[in-house]
């Protein structure tokens, strides 16, 4: 059990579990909403124009809307839950706080750049050593990146700008703090990283080394969070890491 838990609201592993379940449920609900609207639209079009519905397959635009709505819904849940259940912890920088505050030393941002570089090099080496089969990369991210037009632009913006903000706040911020208020920092960091890896599974099933890549990134981001008592360096590192795969040749 952690001996550094600070006084504050009741916010521990149980609340972290509810936070995680709500996050997943909101994401699924946002996804389903997009597909329901698409299906209803197809049904109405079929009735109004008197043609058989057939077996339509949702395209990249539907997947893009599903991804966007899922992201928005899960981010809204995260914001509302923390505001209701753990607001006093928001700007506390210790392991038992959420860490939405600047680091105490500017060197934290230099460390963030180093973390992004190490994670990017590791990912590149894994790709060189165990090249992925493009035919097996059929996760949502891969499908959207191969689509033309706004679906590709949308997923790029979400991956580069949205994910570093929301995922750091969720995993290295709120969830880590909830666990660290009862458990040790190593255990909390390990569990947080495993959950982080698991939630990236849909895009990694076609290339198993991808799980190692995400795991290394998650572990490094936890180290940044604990060392500098702030989420902000991790957000920078996450942004740089994701950007490297979208904007570097």
Give each language-model segment a name.
Residues 21-30, 107-127, 158-163:
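Alpha-helical transmembrane segments of multi-pass integral membrane proteins
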Residues 9, 13, 52-56, 82, ...:
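Generic preference for well-ordered secondary structure
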């Amino acid at each position: 059990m952690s001996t550094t838990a600070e006084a504050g609201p009741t916010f521990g592993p149980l609340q972290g579990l509810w936070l995680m379940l709500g996050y997943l449920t909101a994401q699924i609900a946002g996804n389903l909403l997009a597909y329901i609207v698409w299906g209803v639209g197809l049904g109405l079009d079929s009735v109004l124009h008197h043609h058989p519905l057939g077996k339509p397959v949702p395209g990249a635009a539907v997947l893009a809307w599903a991804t966007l709505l899922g992201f928005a819904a899960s981010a809204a849940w995260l914001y509302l839950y923390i505001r209701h259940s753990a607001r006093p912890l928001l700007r506390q920088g210790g392991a038992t706080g959420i860490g939405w505050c600047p680091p105490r030393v500017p060197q934290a941002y230099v460390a963030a750049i180093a973390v992004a570089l190490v994670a990017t090099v590791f990912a590149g080496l894994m790709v060189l050593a165990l090249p992925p089969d493009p035919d097996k990369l059929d996760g949502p991210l891969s499908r959207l990146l191969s689509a033309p037009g706004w679906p590709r632009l949308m997923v790029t913006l979400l991956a580069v700008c949205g994910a570093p903000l929301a995922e750091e706040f969720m995993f290295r911020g709120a969830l880590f703090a909830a666990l660290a208020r009862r458990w040790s920092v190593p255990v909390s960091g390990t569990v947080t990283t495993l959950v982080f890896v698991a939630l990236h599974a849909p895009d990694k099933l076609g290339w198993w080394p991808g799980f190692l890549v995400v795991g290394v990134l998650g572990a490094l981001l936890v180290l940044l969070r604990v060392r500098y008592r702030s989420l902000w360096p991790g957000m920078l590192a996450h942004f740089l890491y994701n950007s490297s795969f979208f904007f570097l040749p």
